[in-house]
């Protein structure tokens, strides 16, 4: 398993916990909105920052389809 995949799994589990939602539900929402790959590709940004920054960016992607920190 790649470091990117390990981090993605960590991120989605922590994000789901932060939101009080099941992980599968979060993944289905990301898939439905077409942002799963975008979040996965955010590894190089997300793993270097506070996890709360990743949450803010994911919330922005979910709501608007755009990154919070563009």
Put a short name on every predicted segment:
Residues 43-70:
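Long, compositionally biased
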Residues 17, 23-46:
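Amphipathic, hydrophobic secondary-structure cores in small proteins
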